[in-house]
Amino acid sequence: MPAPQKDGPRANRDIRGVRDVQLIDQDGQNRGVVPFFDALAMAEEVGLDLVEIAPNSVPPVCKFLDYGRFRFNEQKKQNEARKRQKTVEVKEIKLRPGIDKHDYDVKMKAVQRFFEEGDKVKVTLRFRGREIAHQDIGLRLLERVKQETQEVAKVESEPMLEGRQMIMILAPR
């Protein structure tokens, strides 16, 4: 049995290689197994299209529908589903080991806002020059970030050193 076309279900004469179909009329009533050409003639009498709903069943299930309206409604459903879908972004907050209190507070407000929007946050702590020798200061700073966000976020990846920066990823709860 040929697979359905890529742009939706087959309709009318596009349905090929079938002798009988399980027919459902426009009111949703099951008419039983009917020869394909009889079903096509009945659809034309009613002024609707014969649309293949379940091509993989034996015999294939076909229904009387207005094919144009059917395609329109399917497209509408897909668009609605796409609108409801939220893509999770990873936002980055860059810190330094010697960050001042006010600067830290501003960064934490941004982190809170990102979590409210449902985004993940990548906290990057960059070491410059000899600061790399004092990784414990950076680790304490990232632990502080972790403590302050523990109610709204969970740690996805623990702080780890990559080159001259320490990275931690937080995800909203």
UniProtKB/Swiss-Prot annotation:
GO terms (BP aspect): ribosome disassembly
Keywords: Cytoplasm, Initiation factor, Protein biosynthesis
GO molecular function, one term: translation initiation factor activity
Any one GO CC term of the record: membrane
Main location: cytoplasm
Subcellular location: Cytoplasm
Signal peptide range: none
InterPro entries in UniProt: T_IF-3_C_sf (IPR036788), T_IF-3_N_sf (IPR036787), Translation_initiation_fac_3 (IPR001288), Translation_initiation_fac_3_C (IPR019815), Translation_initiation_fac_3_N (IPR019814)
Domain of life: Bacteria
Pfam families, per database record: IF3_C, IF3_N
The keyword Cytoplasm is assigned to this record: yes
PANTHER family xref list: TRANSLATION INITIATION FACTOR IF-3 (PTHR10938), TRANSLATION INITIATION FACTOR IF-3, MITOCHONDRIAL (PTHR10938:SF0)
Function statement: IF-3 binds to the 30S ribosomal subunit and shifts the equilibrium between 70S ribosomes and their 50S and 30S subunits in favor of the free subunits, thus enhancing the availability of 30S subunits on which protein synthesis initiation begins.
Quaternary data: Monomer.
Family: Belongs to the IF-3 family.
Designated name of the protein: Translation initiation factor IF-3
UniProt organism field: Methylorubrum populi (strain ATCC BAA-705 / NCIMB 13946 / BJ001)
Origin organism lineage: Bacteria, Pseudomonadati, Pseudomonadota, Alphaproteobacteria, Hyphomicrobiales
Gene: infC
